[in-house]
Regions:
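Extended, charge-rich alpha-helical segments
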Residues: 166, 197-199
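A short beta-strand micro-motif
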Residues: 45-55
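Short, solvent-exposed secondary-structure boundary motifs
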Residues: 56, 196-197
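Non-Sec secretion/translocation targeting segments of pathogen effectors
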Residues: 192, 227-240
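Mixed-charge (acidic/basic) macromolecular-recognition segments
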Residues: 1-46, 59, 67-185, 189, ...
Length: 240
């Protein structure tokens, strides 16, 4: 504490006050070419970029905080000596994306352009949106960042009941919380939650996931949506 420092260390009197040596040693971390890693945007997708011509454990790391303008990416890479993004090795260091997405990204085959587009598509996602995207990924099984981006841009084509892991929980969510019905708690014991959910499940393209129940309500197939097909829905609205 300040009192302990004053009591144990002799200070140097200056015209501006008394200066005490607290033992802190400053270290230069910027070498004039590669900036150190630092978190300045909580929702940024952080990608470590190194030249393929150098060992994987090289200390010459360029940090990108996606999404970024393409001109900015090009400028940062050029400053680091990488003239072509194809010559760059990528590593995902941090992201706000759900674990389901992080697990499927193969950084050896992903491009900076696709990762940047995905970061842009999810940049303003809320916590609920992130959970819904994780469930949608489990249902649709995309293979790369571009397909995940296309799912993210069409999340309104999915109905999502968060934390519903059984037919009864799904039915209860629909009747009590979805806003589709006027729920009367005095009649709670008379609702057939499980039966109602079973009827919906039979008519839907959905599944239970670790995050809840999710169903796809679009007109085009999931494969077409993930390949960038025109989004469209046969039903208006959704639960989430």
């Amino acid at each position: 504490t300040a009192r302990q420092l004053i009591a144990s260390v002799g200070g140097t009197v200056t015209p501006y006050g008394v200066v005490y040596d607290n033992g802190m040693r400053l270290e230069q971390v910027y070498d004039g070419q590669f900036f150190p890693c630092y978190y300045y945007e909580p929702h940024a997708t952080m990608v470590a970029v190194t030249p393929k011509s150098e060992p994987e454990n090289t200390e010459h790391i360029t940090w990108l905080y996606l999404p970024m303008a393409q001109e900015e990416i090009d400028r940062v890479l050029q400053r680091s000596g990488i003239a072509d993004s194809a010559d760059a090795r990528l590593r995902l260091e941090h992201s706000q994306l759900p674990d389901e997405v992080n697990a499927l990204l193969d950084m050896e085959h992903e491009s900076l352009a696709d990762l940047n587009a995905l970061a842009q598509a999810t940049n303003n996602f809320s916590t609920d949106d992130i959970k819904k995207l994780g469930a949608a990924v489990t249902l649709a099984k995309p293979q790369n960042a571009e397909q995940v981006k296309n799912l993210a841009e069409n999340l309104d084509l999915f109905d999502f009941a968060p934390d519903a892991h059984s037919q009864a929980e799904y039915g209860k969510y629909m009747i009590q919380q979805s806003g589709h019905y006027e729920f009367d708690e005095n009649l709670d014991e008379f609702y057939d939650y499980e039966g109602y959910a079973q009827q919906r499940i039979n008519d839907e393209d959905g599944m239970f996931t670790d995050r809840g129940y999710i169903a796809y309500k679009g007109y085009f197939s999931l494969e077409e949506i993930m390949e960038g097909g025109q989004g469209g829905s046969m039903e208006m609205g959704g639960m989430v």
